[in-house]
Amino acid sequence: MIKKTIPLFALGFRPFYLLAAFWSVAAILEWLMELSGSGIRGIGSIPGIQWHAHEMIFGFATTVVAGFSLTAVRSWTGLETPKGRSLMLLAFFWIAGRLGPLFSSYFVIIDILFLPIIAMIIGKLILQRSMVRNLFLPLILSVLGILNGLFYMSAYGHIGIDSNVPLISSLFLIVMIEIMIGGRVIPSFTANAIVGIKQFRNKSFATVVLAFSATSFLLWIFFPVSVVTALICILTGVLQFILLLGWKPLATRSKPIVWILHAAYFWIPLGFILLGFSSFGLVSMYIALHAFGIGATGGLIIGMITRTAMGHTGRLIKAGAIEVSCYVLVQVTAVIWMVAHLTVGVWFHFTIG
């Protein structure tokens, strides 16, 4: 008797893309309700703003990374990743990690273990094929799992560190994933979509930009108020912008499935420059963090999940009206957030509060 796999659990990205999309809406609605004094989360040990940041990172972004990782590693190695019942169990494990901590702090262990489990699964497959170059993905997922644990331990008062540090570090790690994977796929997708395009792609330069990016993040974590940090961050932003220009973003104007990736990546150089300005005290750090969080991460996620969902199910990779609307809305949201925060006052309360 042939066992049929439920389509939802046939490929790694399907349940996790869906869960991430659902949770992003639910968590944002809860955050808006908390801002207006009518949240349903109740009074707990974790302040609302930190819960919001945590769920955007570990409830939304890393969930997409997990789904992408399971699907990408299957494609890279030719080996099967969890599907059917095992994938269903992973999905339920994720759900327990989201809902359990709302009832008891003991359930946070489920949330903490999710990313290391995904890292172990994909790491084993990558090692089986000796694809050492791709080990960065399970390694980063493992570090994200550790940072998630540090966040909970600091938020509940078990260790004496600022609980914002693991949150910001986690966001920076996610941006590093975007830089590494984006640097591979965005120029490639662009070249495939536009026949005869001439790009500037230099591996040595890309490696230098990657090194500057990692250095900027480390400096900002340990020395956020420093002239050196500010200058390195701004320089990194300029280098990232040069890298992006080499991929010929303006040539993608008629290809929404590609231009969304360029538009989203643009927020990365902008984020570094804003991070440098925050070290000088010229802008709030939250502007830089949301440039990375909404503009870059949100934009790259909506761009990549629509693309990978089409590609891995054998459909034509072309953005329709619904997809384009989603692309535009995410980018407009990022711009509105920036305007709201810069103008504070009326605009901030009207758009966010």
PLM feature segments, named:
Residues M1-G353:
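Hydrophobic alpha-helical transmembrane segments of multi-pass integral membrane proteins
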